[in-house]
């Protein structure tokens, strides 16, 4: 079973004191203010054989997301909707404590949060993925790979997922005596997306709340809370991690800060996606 770096990366006490002393001055190891996000870089169509893909770099954190579409049957309880299946893998090359094998509880948690943010925000219109109502629909496989764990991997996973979905090509569907089949030689459009969604994570270290914690900061944090937002700043997901607690005042302050950061992050995401 893999362990997250925030649980395993041991920071010497003297270094923790150094980091916190910087917080007292309103700055951080990398020169950021407490409310600053790390530089974001998105490379679209990175995996050429996927139907859509995006490589996201958030500081030293690197995440690759790719999509594959296939014709499938709808779920019984949603006969008039397509399917979205999200998987996240923490690759062994991303951090020394990550192990080969099936996804562990940390990867499963990441996948669930990303999935919930996409569904609850209705970023992807699943009703427009129907080929024949009740019989045939598109299933969107969204696979997310953490390539380098430099902290705040959840935000990076959400960004990579959204970018890959916007990059996804939809191919022509043809029907013959055997049913429906995909004609990979003809692209008919893109996935029916309504809007992007972003996640903003804020860590608490002692009495300080910091945006987009890096690996060292996660290693000394008491707890962390993540908020997912639509462009109209509707909250569509909240996730807490870490063993510590937050007061209601901390949560209110964290959400107010996250909301302001989300505005800038959504603008940057739209700019890099060209939407």
From Swiss-Prot:
It is found in: Cytoplasm. Gene3D superfamilies: GHMP Kinase, N-terminal domain (3.30.230.70). One of its GO terms (cellular component) is cytoplasmic exosome (RNase complex). GO terms for biological process: rRNA catabolic process. One of its GO terms (molecular function) is mRNA 3'-UTR AU-rich region binding. It holds the Pfam family RNase_PH_C. It comes from the Archaea. InterPro entries: ExoRNase_PH_dom1, ExoRNase_PH_dom2, ExoRNase_PH_dom2_sf, Exosome_comp_Rrp42_subfam, PNPase/RNase_PH_dom_sf, Ribosomal_Su5_D2-typ_SF, Rrp42_archaea. Keywords: Cytoplasm, Exosome. PANTHER family: EXOSOME COMPLEX COMPONENT RRP42, EXOSOME COMPLEX EXONUCLEASE RIBOSOMAL RNA PROCESSING PROTEIN. Non-catalytic component of the exosome, which is a complex involved in RNA degradation. Contributes to the structuring of the Rrp41 active site. Component of the archaeal exosome complex. Forms a hexameric ring-like arrangement composed of 3 Rrp41-Rrp42 heterodimers. The hexameric ring associates with a trimer of Rrp4 and/or Csl4 subunits. Belongs to the RNase PH family. Rrp42 subfamily. This is Exosome complex component Rrp42. It comes from Saccharolobus islandicus (strain L.S.2.15 / Lassen #1). The gene is rrp42.
């Amino acid at each position: 079973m893999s362990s997250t770096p925030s649980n395993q990366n041991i920071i010497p006490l003297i270094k923790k004191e150094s980091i916190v002393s910087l917080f007292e001055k309103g700055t951080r190891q990398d020169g950021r203010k407490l409310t600053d996000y790390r530089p974001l870089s998105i490379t679209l169509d990175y995996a050429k054989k996927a139907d859509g893909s995006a490589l996201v770099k958030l500081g030293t954190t690197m995440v690759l997301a790719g999509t594959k579409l296939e014709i499938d049957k709808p779920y019984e309880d949603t006969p008039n909707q397509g399917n979205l299946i999200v998987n996240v893998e923490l690759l062994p090359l991303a951090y020394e404590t990550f192990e080969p094998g099936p996804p562990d509880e940390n990867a499963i948690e990441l996948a669930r949060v990303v999935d919930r943010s996409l569904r609850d925000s209705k970023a992807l219109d699943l009703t427009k993925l129907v080929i024949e109502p009740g019989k045939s629909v598109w299933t969107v496989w969204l696979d997310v790979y953490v390539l380098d764990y430099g902290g705040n991997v959840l935000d990076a996973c959400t960004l990579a997922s959204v970018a890959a979905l916007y990059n996804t090509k939809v191919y022509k569907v043809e029907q013959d005596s055997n049913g429906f089949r995909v004609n990979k030689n003809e692209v008919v459009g893109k996935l029916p997306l309504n809007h992007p969604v972003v996640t903003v994570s804020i860590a608490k270290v002692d009495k300080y709340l910091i945006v987009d914690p890096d690996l060292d900061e996660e290693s000394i944090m008491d707890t962390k809370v993540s908020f997912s937002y639509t462009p109209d700043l509707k909250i569509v997901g909240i996730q807490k991690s870490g063993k510590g607690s937050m007061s209601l005042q901390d949560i209110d302050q964290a959400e107010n800060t996250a909301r302001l950061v989300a505005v800038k992050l959504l603008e940057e995401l739209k700019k890099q996606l060209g939407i």
